[in-house]
Each structure stands twice: as C-alpha cells, then as structure tokens.
Amino acid sequence: KVKAGDMLMSIDLKNIKTIAKTLSNARRVKILGKNRTGLSALQFRYRLTKIGFDAEAITDGILMNQMQESLTKGDVVLIFTTRAEDLQYYELIRNISKNGVTTIVVTCTETKLIKQSNYHILLPSIENASTSSFLDNQTIMFVFIEILLAELAYKVNENYNHELKNQVK
C-alpha cells in the first residue's frame, strides 16, 4: 500500500523554507502549469488569496511564451509539472534565467529540468509507487501546496510585521 504521508516525509523542509522566502521576497510571482498541473497552478493561486499574497497563474502555452519578455530580476516563476517532459519549460527557463528571473520547479520526476532551475522540489510519485492506475500525482501536488502555503503565510506575516515596526520608528 502507498501511504502519502510517508512519501511526503521525504521532502526536504529546508527547501520549502527557502522557496517560501524566495516567493515572499519576489517582485512578481508567476505560477505555471499545463493540463492537470495547470489545475495545481490555479489551486496554489487561489490558496494564496487566503493569505493576501498576489500572484498570477498561467496555464496556456502561448501566454507563457508572451510573458517571458516582461520578466526581470526580482521576479519568480514557479512551474508545476508531474513529469517535467514539456520542452517549452526547458526553453522558458533558459530564456528567463538570462534576465535574472528566479525559477522554481515542482515535479515528481528527476529530470534535467530541475538542474536548470534555481530551486526545485522533487515530490514522490504516487503513480510510480502504486499498482493502481487510478492514483494521480495531483493529490501529492495539492498536499505540497498546503505545506508551502503554511510556510509562506508565516513568511508573509513576518515581512508584514517587520514593515510595521519600521513604520513605527
């Protein structure tokens, strides 16, 4: 039997803290995903609203190409992809990295894409660990989103309190 809780224990919490800090300090955040991972991108965007954090989810390949030109240093692009096979993501990371954009990849497969990004989270693959064809890696993505959101909420609140203290001085 596959236990998602056991699988999630393999995720490095230091990486989550680093990614949360990177997102909280970003000028702009773009969250990318296609097909089912597009739903993960949208879910993360919706959940960010809960903590008052603004970001844009993009699930269309044409829009992903168009937004590359406007990204600069201080911006962060987070890509959700279960298999990291989409060649558009490789080209996108290559292009935006030249402008100093920070890239984060969240995936269930160890590929060259994670080596090209600044940060990555390698999630366990339920699909690969199970004999059932009905298990989908999106469940792991959604659980990860909640873990990252909890850490990000802490960072956003920490930044907000720091700004308030500076205003009082």
Q: For each predicted feature, which ranges?
A:
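Residue-level recognition of alpha-helical structural elements
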Residues: D12-N15, S97, Y160
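Glycine-rich phosphate/diphosphate-binding loops that line cofactor/substrate pockets in enzymes
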Residues: K14-A26
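A short, charged, Gly/Pro-tolerant segment at domain boundaries
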Residues: E158-K169
